[in-house]
Structures are given as C-alpha cells and as structure tokens.
Amino acid sequence: MFIGRRYFLKISAQAALCSVFPVTAIASMGRLSAPKRNLFLFNTHTGEKLDVCYYAKGRYQSEALEEINNIFRDYRTGEIRPIRKELLNLLHSISKKLDQPTRFHVISGYRSSETNAELRKKSKYVAKNSLHIQGEAVDIRIPDYDTRWLRKVCVTLNAGGVGYYRKSDFVHVDVGPVRHWQI
C-alpha cells in the first residue's frame, strides 16, 4: 500500500502532538504533587522567628523568600540581599536527614562586605571573599543537638562547605565547593 507524502506528514504531526501533551500533563502533575519545603528559622541576634513554607506546588513562594531574606539579613547594617535557593534547600535537606522538623538558629546569614571586613579584623578565620557576602552561606546551631553531631550530619550530605567552629559552638554550611574543616 502506498502512503502519500501529505497523509504521512498529517499522521506524523498528530502522533507528535499526542506524545507531547501527555508528557506536559504528567510533568505538571508531578510539579503539583512535589512535597512542600518548610523551614523554621530563629535569628539569634534579633530574636525574630519564622516558620514558613518556601516551596509549594512545584514553585518557590516569593513572599516566603522575602521573609527568609529578612531573617538572614546583616543585622549589623540592616542590609538585605537574596539568599540562594540552593542554601535553603540544603537547610531543608539537613532537616530531612534529622527526620524531624528542625528549628535552625541563624547566627550569621548574609553579610555585607563592610561587616565581613570588620569581622576579618577581629578573626583570622573570616574569609576575605566569604560566601556569606553572596548569600550562599549560613552559620547555624540547632537547640538540643550537639554541634559536633550536626557537623557530621551536614558532611554526609556532600552538598557544599561544612565548617565546625567548636569554641563558638556553631556549624557553617554553604553551597560552594564540597569541603569541610574544623576550628
């Protein structure tokens, strides 16, 4: 049986459309059923608390991100910058790894260049080009968790930098290259 060129093109186009739309529908359904991502944050310097769903129905929630940026702000200058979503996802992964809702005490989130320079004058452990300046790092502690143990949990995620600051009793996590250190 001979099939004409026009008939072949028509059938091919219909097959292509049938194959595209179900995939799009399935992709949308997957996004809508994606689990919510929540964070509970407490800024140790300002006393502010935030319990927020920052990701729902496959999308980041812009109002929630603004609230998070505010909690992570440089408390010394009041300067606010966007915090990388990858960092929020890392905190969420830590919470999931602990297998329970986690209250993160935020010791240092975003830092202005000026604040970072001042801290460098006081401590040799503050990096000149700290990822805090980019909104890509946070120093945390979790109530009732030993920070040594928290450090180990963070290292197992293999998702960026992890620093343990024993004397100051906090763990630094960032979304830079995978590495870890103790001070």
Where are the language model's segments positioned?
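Catalytic cores and adjacent binding grooves of peptidoglycan-active enzymes
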Residues: 2, 37-42, 125-183
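Extracytoplasmic/secreted envelope proteins and their assembly/folding machinery
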Residues: 88-92, 116, 147, 151
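Charged, often glycine-rich, active-site loop that binds/positions anionic groups
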Residues: 114-128
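Acidic helix-start/capping segments at beta-turn-to-alpha-helix junctions
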Residues: 103-117
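N-terminal secretory signal peptides and thylakoid transit peptides that target proteins
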Residues: 1-19
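Sec/Tat-exported extracytoplasmic proteins
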Residues: 94-98, 102, 114, 144, ...
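C-terminal segment of N-terminal export signals and the immediately downstream linker at the start
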Residues: 22-52
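Active-site acidic/histidine clusters and adjacent loop/turn architecture
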Residues: 59-105
